[in-house]
Amino acid sequence: MQSILKPITNLFTMIFQAIHGFVASLDIFGVGAGYVITIFLLTLLVRLILLPLNIKQTRSQQKMQEIQPEIAKLQKKYKNNPEKAQQEMMKLYKENNVNPMSGCLPLLIQMPILFALYYVFTGLTELQGVSFLWLGDLWAPDRTFILPILSAATTYLSSLLMTKFTQSQAGGAPGGMNMNTMNIVMAGMMGVMSIQFPSMLVLYWVIGNLIQMVQTYFIVVLPSKKRAKEKEQYKDIK
């Protein structure tokens, strides 16, 4: 795994060191705070790079939720012919320009970045013993379990915010329970993994989730509220 991710690891090592060099040159932060600000800026950079992909994923998820009632009808209509049901669903996806796998793409891209950063941070031995707030060693896992809990909580809330508003736009489309279960499982996995990860890596994930929630608010929540308000105004006119 490490050899496969070596090019990405080397790239992020250079980016991290360049950002930290700039932050350190300002000479206004303590050592620990300087590293945390560096990880914030690195996370912000990664999220900005992934923003077009996240927008595309969000639109695809919204379309998927909108056609869920039609998918349910097809599944019911062809319940004794799964092959025909699959063909009709693929036709429906094509007609609505929906890729059912697009929702997995951002995660598939983020996971190699996450593991590459794991190798970046474990290789930065100068982080050993550097503290910040309750974290006694940014290079080591958080033994207070505060960061793992934050990792699980922000992962779940970030996913919940997205699914809540994409489903509400589709009028509470079916499959919400399955999505919620997936959100819980994903959050649980990240919480468990965060117990063993260096604190700096978990900080990257938590900060990334918080930035994702801000993005979701502006990309999904605000437009959703605006459309709901327009619908209410249209009903009042009628």
UniProtKB/Swiss-Prot annotation:
Membrane topology: Multi-pass membrane protein
GO cellular component, one term: plasma membrane
Protein's UniProt keywords contain Chaperone: yes
Pfam families reported for this sequence: 60KD_IMP (PF02096)
Cellular compartment(s): Cell membrane
CDD domains according to UniProt: 5TM_YidC_Alb3 (cd20070)
One GO molecular-function entry: membrane insertase activity
Protein's UniProt keywords contain Magnesium: no
Sequence intervals crossing the membrane: 4-24, 26-46, 104-124, 145-165, 175-195, 201-221
Top-level taxon: Bacteria
Record GO biological process: protein insertion into membrane; protein transport
Keywords: Cell membrane, Chaperone, Membrane, Protein transport, Transmembrane, Transmembrane helix, Transport
InterPro entries: YidC/ALB3/OXA1/COX18, YidC/Oxa/ALB_C, YidC_ALB_C
Complex formation: Interacts with the Sec translocase complex via SecD. Specifically interacts with transmembrane segments of nascent integral membrane proteins during membrane integration.
NCBIfam families linked: yidC_oxa1_cterm (TIGR03592)
Recorded family membership: Belongs to the OXA1/ALB3/YidC family. Type 1 subfamily.
Function: Required for the insertion and/or proper folding and/or complex formation of integral membrane proteins into the membrane. Involved in integration of membrane proteins that insert both dependently and independently of the Sec translocase complex, as well as at least some lipoproteins. Aids folding of multispanning membrane proteins.
Protein name: Membrane protein insertase YidC
Organism: Clostridium perfringens (strain 13 / Type A)
